[in-house]
Amino acid sequence: MISLKTLGLSFLLSSLFVTSLAHAQPTLEKLWLAEGLNIPESVLVYRNGKTNFLFVSQINGDASTVDGNGSIARLTLDGEVDEPNWVTGLNAPKGMGVFEGKLYVSDINEIVVIDIKSAQIEKRLVVPGAVFLNDIAIDAKGTLYVSDTRTNKVHRYEKGLLDDYLVKVESANGLKVIGPNLVVGAGTHLYLVDKSKNRLQIAAGFAQGIDGIESIGKGDFLVSCWAGLLYYVHLNGKMDLLIDSQKEGINTADIGFDSQTQTVFVPNFAKNSVTAYKVVTN
């Protein structure tokens, strides 16, 4: 673990710490349940003018197998399955990101580029040495980051070039870009990584390995653990458990979040469903 090294990170932590202290215990209000999906792993909110959808990656098989069974479903924001197989020809698609009309999807050892308007696969970028590509995050300039949970790396795709951006990131999974920084889920730890690759621990002690990360504003995060846990995480390290569905066998995989409606979308993986909740903070 690299200790806090920069004044910039220290200032960011202290300012967000004060904001986070003001938050009361958040709660969830269930809005809807969309069923009939095929092992949904990740949900991405897509808003572009009047075009508003949820993209849902569907593994439809083993998460590590090249079988051609994977696809992307398209749902309305109200939970209607608009296109159950909007794009097909994938293997085990997981994390997604959007930049300039393209949907980028992690798929075992590839980054698949899909044109959103035509719903056609345009390109497949093979990541050398990749074994289990998982989450994707894209910054405002189009730099893409993708985690590999099996090799403990975060790869970067920038200006047509791929490299290993971070190494020795235990069970690297969830990613989220916050300004110039990258938030990374590494096993049961949540880190903030600055441009100099200094790592600041935001929170630790999650009961299971981190899967999805979403910024909820004012320095707070929603963090899911695949096994069936959803946390509200404050920048001061305080964690509020919102969902524990482990005993029921209801997974909480790579979540999506709509900041306009304060809605979190939870893919339930083996239950073949997505559940939407309103996040209520007082």
Task: Give the ranges of each region predicted by the language model.
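Bacterial N-terminal signal peptides
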Residues: 8-19
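A short beta-strand motif characteristic of beta-propeller blades
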Residues: 28-34, 80-87, 120-126, 161-167, ...
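Beta-rich, blade/repeat-based domains predominating
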Residues: 37-51, 68-69, 87-102, 108, ...
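Beta-propeller domains
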Residues: 56-78
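Short glycine/acidic-enriched loop and turn motifs that connect beta-strands
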Residues: 60-64, 151-152, 189-191, 271-273
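WD40 beta-propeller blade core
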Residues: 73, 112-113, 155, 191-192, ...
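Short loop/turn segments that connect beta-strands within beta-propeller blades
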Residues: 76-79, 115-120, 157-161, 194-198, ...
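Blade-level signature of beta-propeller repeat domains, shared across WD40, Kelch, NHL, RCC1
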Residues: 254-282
